[in-house]
A protein has these predicted regions:
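Flexible beta-alpha connector loops of hexameric P-loop NTPases
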Residues: 1-9
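Active-site oxyanion-binding pockets that recognize sulfate/phosphate
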Residues: 2, 24, 103
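Short alpha-helical interface patches
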Residues: 7-8, 46-47, 122
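Hydrophobic alpha-helical membrane-association signature
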Residues: 8-12, 109
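ATP-dependent NMP and nucleoside kinases share a basic, alpha-helical "lid"
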Residues: 11, 16-74, 81
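Short, residue-level hotspots on alpha-helical faces of the histone-fold
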Residues: 18, 115-116
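Small-molecule kinase domains that catalyze NTP-dependent phosphoryl transfer to phosphate-bearing small molecules
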Residues: 56-112, 118-126
C-alpha cells in the first residue's frame, strides 16, 4: 500500500542518516514511486547528503529484464499496488543525475553514477 511504501522509505532514510552521522558513505537503491516519498527521504537525510539519481527505465525495458515475472503477475492482477502498473510512478522532476538504462550498459551506467558521486565524497584527513 501507499502507507507501507512511505514507511519503508522512511525506515531506509532513518538508517541511512545513522550511517551518515557516523561518517559512513551510504548509497541506497530502492523504488520510490512518488515525489512525496522522495521528499520524505530527503528531509530525513538532509539536502546536503541527499543525491537523487534517477535510474530511468521504461516499463517495456523493466518487463524485458524481469526474470521473476513480477510485471506479468502485476498485469494479470496477481500482484496489486505495483509501481508503474497498478500504482503510480512519478518520475523525478529534477534529479541530480539521470541514467537511461535503455541506452547505457550496466558498466556505462555504473561509471556515470560513480563519476558523479565520488567527487562529492569528502574523506577525512589522516
Amino acid at each position: 500500500s501507499s502507507e507501507d511504501r512511505k514507511e519503508n522509505i522512511r525506515r531506509i532514510a532513518e538508517v541511512s542518516k545513522l550511517f551518515i552521522n557516523c561518517g559512513i558513505v551510504t548509497l541506497n537503491c530502492f523504488i520510490s514511486p512518488t515525489i512525496e516519498i522522495r521528499e520524505i527521504a530527503k528531509n530525513i537525510i538532509g539536502k546536503k547528503n541527499f543525491i537523487e539519481v534517477y535510474i530511468n527505465a521504461t516499463i517495456k525495458t523493466c518487463e524485458q529484464r524481469d526474470v521473476k515475472g513480477l510485471y506479468k503477475k502485476a498485469r494479470s492482477g496477481e500482484i496489486t499496488h505495483f509501481s508503474g502498473i497498478s500504482a503510480p510512478f512519478e518520475a523525478p522532476k529534477n534529479p541530480a543525475l539521470e541514467i537511461n538504462t535503455a541506452k547505457l550498459s550496466i558498466d556505462e551506467s555504473t561509471k556515470k553514477v560513480l563519476d558523479y558521486i565520488l567527487p562529492t565524497i569528502k574523506m577525512p584527513s589522516i
